[in-house]
A protein has these predicted regions:
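C-terminal segment of classical bacterial N-terminal signal peptides
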Residues: 15-24
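A composition-driven surface/loop motif
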Residues: 26-480
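Thrombospondin type-1
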Residues: 480-548
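Solvent-exposed, low-complexity, repeat-rich "mucin-like" stalks and linkers
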Residues: 549-577
Length: 597
């Protein structure tokens, strides 16, 4: 009996080894392309592809090459159920849903997860009206989208839907667009690979339909009950690791983040080349557009945006920040710890709040920045980092910074680097005149925590400039002094500034106690030949010209006074002209002072 049981167990083990291996969701995305469990050709297929398991699928199109640019499949890939987490490899598939079909090109439904890999030939996906191209409407489950290096996938959302993410958040059962899973969320979505970024370095293009984000939330919609409106879903918990991502929001929506009247938050960029452009009144990365001012501490503020690597370019549209708030949307908790970041605001901050709104708790370290509030084109009062237009009158602000709130805007380096700035700002001159300054260069030393409070950035000849920077370039550089700075007074723009005197460094610590004495030179008393600053001992004036008296007569006495050096003493002397009587004098030959010739 025992031998029979052992034989049965051995047979079961042999059978199990012959079964295809299924990759489970817990394993995460694959590093390379595997052997597939299922292959499906969509060319001439007349029904949706429905997936309810976690196997690996290869979905391709055998359409002839001469038809590939014009032929499109009009069915969807439907991934359904909380047990589903398939790995779907898509090769050269073009899906274009009819506007009235109510279908995304690829749909995750009923809490499903999915790993989508675009390989081989390029693919294009178009959602129906109200539907995203790749739609994930719930916060449950996760979506990974990866493109093989050399492959491009282009996703376009339908009217009121995201390119990748949420549908139109319509909950009115009487609306023809309605179905039960239309929450408008674009949540818990991942792009690229952390473990094999070079392999998965392809291009993902995502464009939202009107009111929908490129990647993130769809538009708000009605519930169908009088006065009861459901706002747009959330564009949050969005993660970017590798490859190129080009995200463009539809009108009133962010490139990455919130749709119209939808929030954009918890966005994390670890690598890749990310280009995000908002639609009209949408941020590049962050919040969508609102019609009333949102609360800084409320759920609709653009918040918790983290960039630690890669190259990021973000452009906000009218009334919006590049990274942060859309129209009427404040921003908080933005952290950048590396990478190259370019951001442009349009009446919003480059990084921070949209128009009428603050940006708060923004920390940028060990990164390269190129930021602009488009002041030259708009005359906006928005800052490069912090507040949007119409929050402050900048002339009043730089004249009296006490009117401002402490928004905790900080730059620096956690790696012992110096921070180098090139900027344009509005500030007060050394004569207290309000003016615009450009091509201002600074090299700064972070404090013991590696940070620099931008509100402390002031110089006696560009007073309080840290409050109203409009254009900012920032890099971090090695410290030539290795932290052992030769601090002292240096002369800059006819002012004394406490800084490192090493000519290869010249950095300053804006938080140093001695920096409080930075200012215009204070003339001290005259010495015998020199006059110096009473604070820093910088030479201000030097007396090098001897006093001159003209038309001196023989035998008369004169007194000479050196007025320039403050009359240190007066000397009487007698002039002697040795010319004989009747002869013309050839000039004074000697002067006798106090009996000494």
């Amino acid at each position: 009996m025992k031998k029979r049981i052992l034989s049965i167990l051995l047979l079961c083990c042999m059978v199990l080894t012959l079964l295809p291996t299924t990759v489970l969701a817990a394993d995460g995305p694959m590093d390379t392309i595997p052997k597939y469990d299922v292959s499906i050709d969509v060319y001439n297929r007349t029904s949706d592809i429905s997936i309810k398991d976690s196997r690996s699928y290869y979905i391709y199109s055998s359409v002839p090459d001469k038809l590939r640019d014009t032929w499109a499949w009009d069915k969807k890939i439907f991934i359904k159920g909380d047990k589903a987490a398939p790995h779907v490899f898509i090769d050269g598939v073009n899906i274009k849903m009819s506007p009235s079909s109510k279908g995304p090109a690829i749909e995750l439904n009923k809490k499903a997860s999915a790993y989508l890999y675009f390989i081989g030939k390029d693919s294009t996906l178009q959602g129906a009206d109200g539907r995203a191209a790749i739609q994930k409407n719930r916060s449950e489950g996760q979506l990974y989208v990866l493109a093989r290096t050399g492959t491009t996938v282009t996703c376009k959302g339908g009217y009121r839907a995201a390119g990748i993410g949420g549908s139109w958040a319509i909950r009115n059962i009487g609306d023809s667009m309605f179905n039960m899973d239309m929450y408008g969320h674009g949540v818990n979505m991942h792009f690229g690979s952390q473990s094999n970024p070079d392999y998965w370095g392809g291009t993902i293009n995502a464009t939202g339909g009107e009111y929908g984000a490129g990647i993130g939330a769809g538009s708000w919609g009605h519930s169908g009950h009088s006065g009861n409106t459901i706002h747009g879903g959330a564009g949050e918990r969005l993660y970017f690791y590798s490859g190129t991502v080009n995200a463009s929001g539809g009108r009133l929506a962010a490139g990455i983040g919130g749709g119209f009247r939808g929030r954009g938050s918890h966005i994390y960029i670890y690598g890749g080349n990310i280009d995000a452009q908002g639609g009209d009144t949408g941020a590049g990365i962050g919040g969508g557009s609102w019609t009333t001012k949102q609360d800084m501490d409320g759920i609709n503020a653009a918040s918790d945006i983290v960039i630690s690597g890669g190259r990021v370019s973000a452009r906000g549209q009218y009334n919006c920040a590049g990274i942060g708030g859309g129209q009427y949307v404040p921003a908080r908790n933005i952290t950048i710890t590396g990478g190259h970041v370019s951001a442009t605001g349009h009446y919003g901050a480059a990084i921070g709040g949209g128009r009428w709104c603050h940006g708060k708790n923004i920390t940028i370290t060990d990164a390269t920045l190129n930021l602009s509030s488009l002041y030259h084109f708009t005359n906006s009062n928005a800052s490069a980092i912090g507040f949007g237009d119409l929050v402050y009158d900048t002339e009043e602000l730089v004249t009296d910074p006490s009117i401002a709130t402490n928004d905790q805007i900080r730059i620096g380096s956690y790696k012992g680097k110096l921070v180098q700035l090139k900027l344009e700002a509005r500030a007060l001159s050394r004569d207290d005149e309000y003016s615009y300054f450009w091509n201002l260069y600074e090299t700064l030393i972070p404090d013991e925590n590696g940070l620099i409070d931008m509100q402390l950035l002031t110089l006696p000849y560009v007073q309080n400039y840290g409050w109203a920077i409009n254009v900012l370039e920032m890099t971090v550089i090695d410290d030539p002094c290795n932290g052992n700075h030769d601090f002292g007074w240096v002369n800059r723009q006819s002012c004394h500034v406490w800084a490192c005197r090493n000519k290869d460094c010249q950095a300053r610590d804006p938080a140093a106690e001695m920096s409080k004495q930075n200012g215009k030179h204070v003339p001290g008393d005259w010495g015998v030949r020199e006059r110096r600053c009473a604070v820093c001992d910088h030479l201000l004036e030097k007396d090098t010209a001897a006093p001159v008296l003209e038309v001196l007569n023989d035998g008369e006495s004169y007194t000479v006074e050196d007025v320039i050096v403050g009359r240190p003493g007066a000397y009487s002397f007698t002039v002697s002209d040795p010319a004989k009587s009747g002869e013309a004098s050839s000039g004074v030959k000697s002067v006798t002072i106090n009996g000494v010739e």
